[in-house]
């Protein structure tokens, strides 16, 4: 009897220990943004002007890779880069900004995201200089995915940052293909991947939807101000923003004429409403730059 009781007590204690052990290891998140936040918090730019200039010249393709001068920068930022690159493999990305509750993107957000992208571009250049073209391609593709994730659930400033990040990483892919640094098998595999990327990078209408929500909230709150905006002005603003979203879901070439048609509507809006609206033409020009970069890459990949 005592032996059975002792065995029961030991089994209960063992199960409790197992439960505690399991509780210490919760499942990992599928939200890439949480890891991006860590990477953005860790990334550091070069501390001296000479190194920063060399960094810029190298990513621009004007000078060759210099391991002794630029390698330490990448080594210092290795954890941030690895965290970002691993995050691009996750299926979701929600940055968590609650714009309707007054949240705003921190001023440093876009600057650090772009720095992380440029370091990723530099890492690919380093990989290529060391003869590892396959790793270089994967590094730059991770940068493209990071740019696409940057665009998710953010306003137009996030979309413009995303567009710059994608360009940072499409251009070295194009240059490598044009300069014969990729073999035919690599070019064929990369071509398949690039075809899955939207021609303008991502859905720009989402960013304008966020801008619409932010601006509309501001205007609705203005109803309680001493000089509230009129219902007609608010309605005209809403109609313009909805039309702009629709335009941005057409191809950039098709959107150009539609944007011209909308400009009289923009000029008729009140000053307050106009100040809430980003440049629709500037947004479409950014889309055109992405289309051009993607087309140039596809052309380089198809050249024997």
Language-model features: locations:
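Bacterial N-terminal signal peptides
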Residues: 7-16
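Short acidic linear motifs
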Residues: 16-304
């Amino acid at each position: 009897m005592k032996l059975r009781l002792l065995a029961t007590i030991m089994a209960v204690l063992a199960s409790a220990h197992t439960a505690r052990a399991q509780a210490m290891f919760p499942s990992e998140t599928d939200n890439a943004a949480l890891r991006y936040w860590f990477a953005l918090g860790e990334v550091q730019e070069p501390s001296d002007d000479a190194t920063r200039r060399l960094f810029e010249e190298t990513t621009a393709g004007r000078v060759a890779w210099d391991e002794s001068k630029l390698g330490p920068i990448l080594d210092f930022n290795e954890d941030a880069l690895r965290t970002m690159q691993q995050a691009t493999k996750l299926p979701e990305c929600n940055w968590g900004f609650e714009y309707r509750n007054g949240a705003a993107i921190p001023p440093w957000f876009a600057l650090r995201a772009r720095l992380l992208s440029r370091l990723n571009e530099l890492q690919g250049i380093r990989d290529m200089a060391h003869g590892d073209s396959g790793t270089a391609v994967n590094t730059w593709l991770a940068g493209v995915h990071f740019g696409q994730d940057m665009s998710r659930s953010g306003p137009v400033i996030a979309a413009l940052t995303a567009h710059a990040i994608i360009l940072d990483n499409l251009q070295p892919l194009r240059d490598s293909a044009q300069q014969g640094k990729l073999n035919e098998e690599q070019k064929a595999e990369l071509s398949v991947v690039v075809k899955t990327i939207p021609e303008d990078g991502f859905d720009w209408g989402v960013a304008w939807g966020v801008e619409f929500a932010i601006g509309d909230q501001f205007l609705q709150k203005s109803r309680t101000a001493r000089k509230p905006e009129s219902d007609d002005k608010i309605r005209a603003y809403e109609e313009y923003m909805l039309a702009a979203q629709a335009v941005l879901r057409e191809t950039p070439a098709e959107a150009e004429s539609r944007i011209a048609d909308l400009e009289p509507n923009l000029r008729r809006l009140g000053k307050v409403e106009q100040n809430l609206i980003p440049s629709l033409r500037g947004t479409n020009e950014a889309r055109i730059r992405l289309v051009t970069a993607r087309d140039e890459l596809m052309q380089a990949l198809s050249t024997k």
